[in-house]
């Protein structure tokens, strides 16, 4: 069969010249699509339905109809751009579905029985301290505008049941953070969705969108958000949230410290604790203290107890509480500096400089001969050690006291941001970490002004199987 015959067979009709030339360079992909056995694929879809879709199971005939309908969609489309998108979507599905999602229903006898890598801890041991910390952080009135992601899709239950298995089968390329990772540490923690980082977010979401379409008939949309680094989110027809995922390179994935619990990797709880402290420099996170206090207390109790155990530290022991609050802010340059040298000469570098504009850090790195460290969306900043300083990008807002100094809440956030670098590189930082953890209850200072965060440029990028919108990013 020559190329023209192959293209005509794929289209279900004779291709005109513009369409033929557009598809000529896609012949290899088209051949793989045509050679794909839809009957085998149907069996994978049905196994997925029977294992993970507990309610509203669709009839086999309806799932088969949707599968056939999509793989003949090009027969009914005339626009060249849409046909090209269909080719790309179909090619991703036929070449990756089995290893990405199809494998979830295959018995995995190669995996030995795994035991939790964590000790049994008393996660309520420091509840009073955490409660005092969170109450001292209540510096807003809680009346801020509601955050965007309030609506959750009814598809979440179906997706979560798959994601738990997905994280086990793909733990060399995917791991989780957030509430589900804390649930693995402490089963008393409730979770609503599963937050993931992985090396193939786009491929995973395309396959998931197709699986949802075939097994439920529901239509989803994927969107890449410009102001969050390598972040893709999936919505349903009502713009309700289904799942999201951060994309990281394999190099960054391997560099991020993590622990294994029940075959699932989670980000090192110390990194998660520091990130939680850092995020309180955002006013909307401070507003959460008025509406989600109990949840936040349980989460911070869990993380703090694990870190104290892991680093063999105690609250109330040691010296230097509050020392990491020795920071200043240059308003015109939008640069904050933390002097951390007071806690010991062994810390290097001891001066931490936070640029609030990413372009300023990029310029500094570009002018340097030293290699910057990159941890992707985990820190949302590259870091550069140079001339006795550690430079980074602080992507949050910054709270200032009336005299123009960083507010204690933001001082802790800045310290947590830079301590993530030391933890993730394995550099010694125990005295500084102990100092921060003993400084979580901040002095009362309700008055503050807000320094806005860096405004990220870019457009939202849409991928849609239903509307044939395929963009390679």
UniProtKB/Swiss-Prot annotation:
It holds the Pfam family Pox_polyA_pol_N. Its EC number is 2.7.7.19. It catalyses: RNA(n) + ATP = RNA(n)-3'-adenine ribonucleotide + diphosphate. The keyword Transferase applies. It comes from the Viruses. SUPFAM superfamilies: Poly(A) polymerase catalytic subunit-like. The active site is at 193, 195. GO terms for molecular function: ATP binding; poly(A) RNA polymerase activity. Keywords: ATP-binding, mRNA processing, Nucleotide-binding, Transcription, Transferase. One of its GO terms (biological process) is mRNA processing. InterPro entries: PolyA_pol_cat_Poxvir, PolyA_pol_cat_sf, PolyA_pol_nucTrfase_Poxvir, PolyA_pol_nucTrfase_sf_Poxvir, Poxvirus_polyA_pol_cat_C, Poxvirus_polyA_pol_cat_N, Poxvirus_polyA_pol_cat_N_sf. Belongs to the poxviridae poly(A) polymerase catalytic subunit family. Heterodimer of a large (catalytic) subunit and a small (regulatory) subunit. Polymerase that creates the 3'-poly(A) tail of mRNA's. This is Poly(A) polymerase catalytic subunit. It comes from Nile crocodilepox virus (isolate Crocodylus niloticus/Zimbabwe/Ume/2001).
